[in-house]
Amino acid sequence: MNTAFAGFDENRAGRRAPGCTGRPAFGLGMDSQQDVVNLDQGGCCPALRKLLPRGFWDEARALFVLSGPLFLFQVLNFLTYVVGTVFCGHLGKVELASVTLGVAFVNVCGVSVGAGLSSACDTLMSQSFGSPNKKHVGVILQRGSLILLLCCLPCWALFLNTQHILLLFRQDPAVSRLTQDYAMIFIPGLPAIFLYSLLAKYLQNQGIVWPQVLSGVVGNCVNGVANYALVSVLNLGVRGSAYANTISQFVQAAFLFLHIVLKKLHLETWEGWSSQCLRDWGPFLSLAIPSMLMMCVEWWAYEIGSFLMGLLGVVDLSGQAIIYEVATVVYMIPMGLGMAVCVRVGTALGAADTLQAKRSAVSGLLCTAGTSLVVGTLLGLLNSQLGYIFTSDEEVIALVNQVLPIYIVFQLVEAVCCVFGGVLRGTGKQAFGAIVNAIMYYIVGLPLGIVLTFVVGMRIMGLWLGMLTCIFLAAVTFVVYAVQLDWKLAAEEAQKHAGLQQQQQQQQQQGAECTAPSPGPDKAVVSSVATGCNPGIALTMYSRPGCHVDFYGRPEAAPAPAAPASRLSVRQLLFRRGAALAASVAVLMAGLLVRVLTTGY
């Protein structure tokens, strides 16, 4: 079976030299007869080459080509929030605290939910794009859009009550009030950022990454100009920063959408809106909810850690803030590689190419380990100078210098977890990742960190030692799981996600018509030409690589399969989706009612 990887040279990565023999390559359950390193090859470091899978350098090149723009994309998203913080930081301590808390609240109660749910597309879109059924990618985009837009309503209910939630956690009343303003203004921006995330996933899982970077540049330019105009010129303060952020989110989403349409990047995977987007919400959510938990469990753990440091005093909180900012930027490097691994693994499994999927996973692990070693070395060289970038307070700088060696080891292990997270998303095993993260962070990491911080008296170092312990155990668990992973079963599940099993049933039914008793001479000619098959021979879905020839004479990419008759009727679908809409609206109305009843208290 031929496979197609958008923009990647598969043949070079998968080519084996005749008669290649030798010891098995280091890998995740790799076949010793297929994944071997030719020890007869020339070159230096023969001992090192024994650890590398065949085609490693080509695969590494493909991963870095993908992950480089994805890293820039993440940095640009991060800068969107930094710009607003910088502008409001010059207004005063209350304004700085308010915009910082506002961004954190919006991220935890809104953005993280959408980012997590949209991660289901990493599995479904990459696997569908790797299969002959590429049109199914468009159906997944439609389905994800509807589900994420519904999820906006419960998030809005939280935004409406931001002030009361913060006061429950004993935050400053003045800061809580301004944070409420920030969240309220950002309400219309949440659907924009959700759709932007989906469009980015839509392109990313086809191997298209530069439009996202370009949209991020445009969004940041608009954000900077808007912050200057609204915060510095019109003196709108925190509200101006919120307006600027909301505007930039709409600009980014609109720019990326127009780029897709005008550049016709959707032609291969989109054939219009379909009622299929109302189906299979269960399988989508079975991946989306674990994806969200896998991401949010880790995200929220660090936010809790920052909150705990605030209980110790300003010095520890400041030190935690500096380490956290460094960690956020450094994390984007393995995150980009993890995304690239997810795309490569998912696309390979969609094409039923388990060998390529394993090669991508192993190569991604080695690339991530190498980049993390480089980052760790740079941080070690900057050990005594890093704190001065953020502050001139000697006490805070000394604290940062104490914690930095722990973080250097931490980021290396975290990078391993990050790339295995990409493997889990590519194979559709997010539920396992969510369970491991929940156990390690909330049963091991945070409790151990709290004991070391408050009982033993290690303060901020205790927190990071607890985090290092949990991330190390998580990495070991992921490695053991990946080594035992059944790649053939993962490929079969990928065919289900891509809708190929339904399509095979259709093809068999339509192929049976092709084997029916031979029609009259005129009809026989039409049949053999229009269907692309000879009378008496049934077509298979792989009549041409990545292409489906329909039975009306239109060669085109494989369409999304029609639903079997045994599935829910349109009326049943509308009833169920209407019930989901009603439930989301009910949550929003409950939030609105709470806000009205508590106003003035």
UniProtKB/Swiss-Prot annotation:
The keyword Chaperone does not apply. One of its GO terms (cellular component) is apical plasma membrane. It catalyses: thiamine(out) + H(+)(in) = thiamine(in) + H(+)(out); estrone 3-sulfate(in) + H(+)(out) = estrone 3-sulfate(out) + H(+)(in); creatinine(in) + H(+)(out) = creatinine(out) + H(+)(in). Expressed in renal cortical tissues. It is a multi-pass membrane protein. Residues 84-95, 167-182, 234-241, 302-320, 383-402, 459, 599-601 are extracellular. InterPro entries: MATE_euk, MATE_fam. Coiled coil: none annotated. Residues 1-62, 117-145, 204-212, 263-281, 342-361, 424-437, 481-577 are cytoplasmic. Optimum pH is 6.0. One of its GO terms (molecular function) is xenobiotic transmembrane transporter activity. Its main location: membrane. One of its GO terms (biological process) is xenobiotic detoxification by transmembrane export across the plasma membrane. The chain crosses the membrane at residues 63-83, 96-116, 146-166, 183-203, 213-233, 242-262, 282-301, 321-341, 362-382, 403-423, 438-458, 460-480, 578-598. It is found in: Cell membrane; Apical cell membrane. Keywords: Antiport, Cell membrane, Membrane, Transmembrane, Transmembrane helix, Transport. Belongs to the multi antimicrobial extrusion (MATE) (TC 2.A.66.1) family. Multidrug efflux pump that functions as a H(+)/organic cation antiporter. Mediates the efflux of cationic compounds, such as the model cations, tetraethylammonium (TEA) and 1-methyl-4-phenylpyridinium (MPP+), the platinum-based drug oxaliplatin or weak bases that are positively charged at physiological pH, cimetidine or the antidiabetic drug metformin. Mediates the efflux of the endogenous compounds creatinine, thiamine and estrone-3-sulfate. Plays a physiological role in the excretion of drugs, toxins and endogenous metabolites through the kidney. This is Multidrug and toxin extrusion protein 2. It comes from Oryctolagus cuniculus.
